[in-house]
């Protein structure tokens, strides 16, 4: 690891991208470019699968990506690590969701799956069809049903759902983050945004003290707790603040640039 080189990890939504309609502030673009010129390595660290990362983010020229909450790791356009839930567990998830009357969609590195037999499909599925390949797993023939996998999934309980039974099942097998819009982000228990940082730091010969994490929500907590320096955006969920080194201004108020200047990264 070169002297003074740091590894910088950025969440996407609310950190790099503003709220809808998504955009990247010009101050963020310039700060990332300046940090790269100073020799630092820049990584996206997101709950999104790689296929769902916006082209406007990819155009920023990151050195790598931690995707799917640590289930896929890329560097220099090479896939270094990938982990999916085993097929028997994936089938059990589908069956449990059906029993508990909960709609969901399921994320793979290359596509999104959904259960067309669900009475209430997530509205997000219609939007996703314009962004990424989408597939109805209820149409699978036996061979595909017995081999398909996914990395993580989003569940959308409503007032008619048996959330108590489903939560017991989730807690036994997965990690779960409940978002402000009531979506449950459900990820593999052994992998997180933190394990993604650890993997890349080990590969690059960096210590945790050489890592910076930038985030704004509870699913960023693992990486914020692991990184040597953790930075909360100005509009962050208050729950993450006790776990952060520093709170910068909001994304719309040059938050990324201000944090980088504060820590002399640029």
Where are these regions (language model features)?
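Asp-based phosphoryl-transfer active-site loop
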Residues: 4-21
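Conserved acidic, metal-coordinating active-site core of Asp-based
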Residues: 96, 100-103, 107-214, 218-226, ...
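Asp-based, Mg2+/Mn2+-dependent phosphohydrolase catalytic module
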Residues: 226, 231-266
């Amino acid at each position: 690891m070169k002297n003074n080189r740091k590894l910088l990890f950025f969440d996407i939504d609310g950190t790099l991208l503003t709220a809808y309609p998504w955009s990247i502030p010009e101050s963020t673009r310039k700060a990332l470019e300046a940090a790269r010129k100073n020799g630092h390595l820049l990584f996206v660290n997101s709950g999104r699968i790689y296929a769902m990362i916006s082209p406007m983010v990819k155009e920023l020229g990151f050195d790598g990506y931690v995707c799917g909450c640590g289930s896929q790791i890329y560097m220099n356009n090479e896939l270094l690590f990938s982990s999916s839930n085993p097929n028997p567990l994936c089938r059990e998830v589908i069956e449990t969701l059906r029993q508990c009357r909960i709609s969901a969609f399921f994320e793979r590195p290359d596509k999104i799956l959904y259960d067309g037999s669900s009475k209430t499909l997530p509205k997000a599925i219609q939007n996703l069809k314009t962004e990424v390949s989408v597939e109805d797993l209820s149409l699978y023939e036996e061979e595909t049903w017995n081999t398909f996998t996914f990395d993580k999934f989003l569940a959308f309980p409503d007032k008619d759902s048996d959330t108590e039974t489903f939560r017991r099942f989730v807690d036994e097998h997965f990690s779960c983050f409940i978002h402000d819009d009531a979506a449950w982000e459900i990820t593999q228990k052994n992998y997180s945004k933190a394990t993604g940082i650890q993997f890349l730091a080990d590969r690059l010969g960096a210590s945790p003290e050489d890592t910076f994490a930038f985030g704004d929500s509870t699913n960023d907590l693992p990486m914020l707790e692991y990184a040597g320096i953790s930075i909360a955006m100005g509009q962050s969920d208050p729950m993450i603040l006790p776990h952060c080194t520093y709170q910068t201004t909001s994304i719309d108020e040059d938050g990324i640039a201000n944090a980088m200047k504060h820590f002399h990264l640029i």
